UniProtKB/Swiss-Prot annotation:
Keywords, ordered alphabetically: Acyltransferase, Transferase
Organism: Halalkalibacterium halodurans (strain ATCC BAA-125 / DSM 18197 / FERM 7344 / JCM 9153 / C-125)
Gene this protein is translated from: ectA
Keyword Transferase tagged: yes
EC number assigned by the record: 2.3.1.178
Protein name stated in the entry: L-2,4-diaminobutyric acid acetyltransferase
Pfam families hit by this protein: Acetyltransf_1 (PF00583)
């Protein structure tokens, strides 16, 4: 199912799954389509990551996520051009958790609330009906992602717990920071 989001038509709000949310940080000037990815989106996801400071994975990772995890991944397109995505999965050992692997937003859409909208779309899907926690790993220097997950906790009026996940000495080379786990929830009382 594709959802059309046209913020100007809703006086600063946006539609996700037919629900109106209010007060995004900035208004988008165009229509953004939010939905499930197809394998054809994998290459565009990889290209978006390569234009950013995100950890680069192989193109295969993005194509594979689109093929086998489309229910837990989200893409945003402007005039058929990919401008944002979330890759995520439900860990087999923790069916009440959605683990967000990566969020990418094109520079043309940063600061407009698109990452929040993508997360809201993900959480609202039927596959997440038993999910009570959102988890992600974030480096200490990634203040934007930290703020995004703290905002998500505020939106759900719940906790955002931060703990060490992977220390920097686990990563090969000298250029990878530690990864902190951000755990948001419970989402439902």
């Amino acid at each position: 199912m594709q959802v059309q989001c046209n913020e100007k038509a809703f006086k600063g709000g946006f539609i996700i799954n037919s629900q109106i949310a209010t007060a995004p940080p900035k208004t988008l000037d165009t229509t953004i389509t939010i939905g499930k990815p197809t394998v054809e989106d994998g290459a565009a996801m990889w290209e978006l990551v390569n234009k950013s400071t995100l950890d680069t994975n192989s193109p295969y990772k993005y194509i594979m996520m689109c093929e086998y995890f489309a229910e837990t991944c989200v893409v945003a397109k402007e005039n058929e051009r990919l401008v944002g995505f979330v890759t995520a999965f439900i860990p087999p050992e923790h069916q009440d958790v959605i683990f967000v692997w990566q969020i990418g937003v094109d520079s043309s859409q940063r600061g407009k609330g698109l990452a929040s909208k993508l997360l809201q779309e993900l959480i609202s899907r039927d596959i997440c009906s038993n999910v009570n926690y959102v988890e992600a790993t974030v480096t200490p220097s990634n203040k934007a992602s930290q703020a995004l997950f703290q905002k998500l906790a505020r939106e759900y009026n719940t906790q955002c717990e931060v703990s060490e996940c992977f220390s920097e000495d686990l990563f090969p080379g000298d250029d990878h920071e530690a990864e902190l786990t951000f755990r948001i929830g419970p989402l439902h009382p």
